[in-house]
Amino acid sequence: MVASAHMSVLTASVAGVPRIIASAPPVNGEPHPAIVAAMHMGGAHEIYVMGGIQAVGAMAIGTETIEPVHMLVGPGNAFVAEAKRQLYGRVGIDLFAGPTETMVIVDHTVDAELCATDLLGQAEHGYNSPAAMITCSEKLAQDTMIEIERILKILPTSETASASWENYGDMILCDTHEEMLGVANDMAYEHVQIMTDRDDWYLENMHSYGALFLGPRTNVANGDKVIGTNHTLPTKKAGRYTGGLWVGKFLKTHSYQRIETDEAAQLVGEYGSRLCILEGFVGHAEQCNVRVRRYGGKNIPYGEAAE
């Protein structure tokens, strides 16, 4: 996908990654010009026409002509996701991604056409893409079910979308907004559209999701493709403990220490000695003790805690 190029390549480029390589499979036996252009404009230093687990392996392990990388990011099918999972540790990855998920949280302020369109718009991703609607309006729930059937008759990708909706679709009717919020936080979906009379309340109280799309003017397609927030997002309830891909994913922190005075070496060493003995680590304690002896002038018996 063209959007995936700027979601991954451009993010790495903004982070200052010194070597960015990108790949996409051929289309009709040729490089896809729009994807290649997006990769190039996003800042890729090397572009390869390949996809699938072979591309993942080439990037992570290296080949005769491709130097291995330190991190893999970007979307793919179930095989690509599994390859990234198995390679995690050898290289870093963005996240463990499953099938895309979409949820709409709605009330009487919107109509069935919007709800059905937004549910099916993401259900066409694949036959196993979950789509859920949470509402406190029974009429809207019934009308949306009817509208889904109508749209499936004219949607070119209806074979895929209908399979997703039939096998992974949920229509959840709640009594209150508080109950809707609780269900949504528990499900922790990737994409969550909120179209209610209290969108900001949901923004303040939602805590488990990939990305929120607030108000009827906003939708997942615009968010994933155009608005600018990253569409590499957590699925399968991973939104409970992590967020999506961002510039910080390509950055890492390091620490260093230096003790510069004899007094500091003695003070820190005495604390360290006592703590290490308390934990049962004599070897650790002696790292502290030897410095207390040298820089503090104290004669601490071997293997004992400093006073």
Describe each model-derived feature in a short phrase:
Residues 1-37:
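Conserved small-residue-rich beta-alpha loop and adjacent elements
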Residues 41-130:
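Conserved NAD(P)+-binding/catalytic subdomain of aldehyde/semialdehyde dehydrogenases
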Residues 102-107, 133, 167-175, 188-194, ...:
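Short, well-ordered beta-strand elements within core beta-sheets of diverse protein domains
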Residues 152-198:
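Glycine-rich, Lys/Arg-enriched anion-binding loops that position phosphate/diphosphate groups
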Residues 177, 185-307:
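C-terminal core of ALDH-fold dehydrogenases
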